[in-house]
């Protein structure tokens, strides 16, 4: 049995297209010149279980849009042109288009995420069907997915191997600089406005009973705190969780891949995004996480099935050859040599010294003025409940040492004086909390004196 469209000579095996007992589960994304990676990204998210994939493109020069158009002709994805109004950036423009898109509005579940992000489900068999069974069993209508930052793994050279198999080294799960989120939720365009990290509840519903109906879980299947119904784009210590799922974020990949992207531009027009500071933030390789390999066989089968279509096959390999030709030209330049040297130096920045873009200063008075009555009442209730729990049982002592230290080769680190003892800020052995204490010179005295 095969999928065919009238007027098309090609066929794709029927097992590629997904259906779900939970209805329409839609991925919404934006792309610009992602040609070498499009088919892997599509194949992976079909393997995970999305029934529909809607991708907005702008200013592509490498065949990304042509591949997506062909996928739409085959009934496997939906391509939309991101027509950008003057003065608006591509990402917000695409979100506005998606908000008005009937296919998205008619979806039962929606997740907005980027082309360098791959959903990784630990729960059950790794499919959205099984995950949503568990979500709905808790009478929840959304789940908040925390980023897991994956680095280059020390890879410099370009490779055609799958992204999800090449890069298996990541930041420690308790590294809070990597706790941005994405949200899979039951979308109703009447109540919600789509956002890149999470949807925003429309103002007219804030003072109604509607917020009481919003029940979201964190990435470990525990209830999210009520404040997140209204604001926030990242996890905090009380809400972070990876037991059920995570969003693998491959922002840098290899040095060669990064070089291609640096001179390609990006979907959000951030001119200085691909620099050494960004590399040091995103090139985190402290621990191995190979959970994604659970999808390898299914993803490869779907990927190979997609390549049986001669049009997709031609477009895919043309995109690879185009990227490799551009890289070959660039690799002979002084600029490439300087880029490699700069990125290798940036890779040596210890995780404790990575500088992230500072968050926008919080104005408590402004926030209070914007808060709805429902949000204030909800927040006060949760604060009271936390105080009562703490009064009954004091907080557990923070975990400072990793249970399974990494056996990777030595990494660059700084040494800090703690109670007369010099300790290394070594992410292979200490948790993020422990590293913060070491840098501040406040690591627990009893533990410091008992370390080997």
Language model features with spans:
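N-proximal low-complexity "stem/linker" segments adjacent to membrane-targeting elements
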Residues: 1-43
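Short beta-strand/loop segment that forms part of the nucleotide-sugar
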Residues: 51-59, 80-84
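The conserved acidic donor/metal-binding loop of glycosyltransferases
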Residues: 114-118
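Catalytic-site signature of metal-activated, phosphate-bearing donor transferases
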Residues: 2-5, 9, 93, 123-349
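Non-catalytic N-terminal targeting/anchoring module and adjacent flexible stem/linker
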Residues: 1-19, 271, 276, 280-452
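Short, acidic, metal-binding catalytic loop of nucleotide-sugar glycosyltransferases
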Residues: 43-52
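Active-site-proximal specificity loops/subdomain of glycosyltransferases
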Residues: 63-110, 120-123
């Amino acid at each position: 049995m095969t999928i065919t469209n009238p007027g098309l000579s090609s066929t794709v095996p029927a097992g590629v297209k997904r259906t779900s007992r939970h209805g329409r589960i839609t991925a919404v994304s934006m792309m610009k010149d992602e040609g070498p990676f499009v088919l892997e990204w599509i194949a992976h998210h079909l393997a995970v279980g999305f029934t529909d994939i809607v991708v907005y493109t702008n200013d592509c020069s490498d065949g990304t849009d042509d591949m997506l158009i062909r996928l739409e002709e085959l009934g496997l994805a939906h391509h939309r042109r991101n027509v950008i109004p003057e003065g608006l950036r591509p990402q917000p423009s695409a979100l506005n288009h998606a908000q008005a898109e009937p296919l998205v509005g008619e979806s039962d579940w929606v997740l907005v995420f980027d082309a360098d992000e791959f959903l990784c489900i630990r729960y059950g068999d790794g499919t959205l069907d099984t995950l949503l069974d568990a979500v709905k069993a808790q009478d929840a209508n959304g789940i908040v997915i925390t980023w897991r930052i994956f680095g280059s793994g020390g890879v410099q050279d370009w490779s055609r191997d799958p992204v999800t198999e090449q890069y298996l080294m990541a930041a420690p799960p308790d590294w809070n600089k990597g706790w941005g989120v994405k949200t899979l939720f039951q979308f109703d365009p009447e109540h919600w406005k789509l956002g890149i990290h999470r949807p925003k509840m429309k103002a007219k519903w804030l003072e109604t009973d509607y917020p009481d109906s919003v029940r979201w879980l964190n990435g470990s299947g525990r209830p999210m705190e009520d404040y997140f119904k209204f604001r926030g784009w990242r996890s905090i210590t009380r809400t972070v969780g990876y037991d059920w799922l995570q969003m693998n974020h491959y922002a840098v990949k290899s040095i060669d891949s990064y070089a291609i992207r640096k001179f390609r531009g990006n979907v959000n027009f951030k001119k200085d995004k691909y620099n050494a500071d960004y590399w040091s933030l995103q090139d985190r390789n402290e621990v191995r996480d190979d959970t994604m390999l659970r999808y390898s066989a299914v993803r490869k089968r779907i990927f190979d099935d997609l390549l049986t279509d001669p049009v997709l096959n031609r477009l895919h390999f043309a995109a690879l050859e185009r990227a490799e030709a551009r890289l070959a030209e660039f690799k002979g330049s002084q600029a490439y040599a300087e880029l490699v040297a700069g990125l290798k130096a940036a890779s040596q920045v210890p995780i404790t010294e990575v500088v992230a873009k500072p968050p926008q200063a919080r104005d408590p008075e402004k926030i209070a003025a914007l808060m709805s009555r429902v949000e204030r009442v909800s927040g006060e209730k949760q604060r009271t409940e936390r105080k009562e729990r703490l009064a009954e049982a004091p907080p557990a002592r923070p975990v400072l040492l990793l249970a399974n230290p990494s056996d990777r080769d030595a990494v660059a680190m700084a040494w800090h004086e703690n109670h007369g003892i010099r300790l290394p800020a070594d992410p292979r052995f200490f948790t993020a909390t422990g590293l913060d204490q070491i840098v501040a010179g406040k690591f627990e005295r009893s533990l410091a004196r008992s370390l080997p």
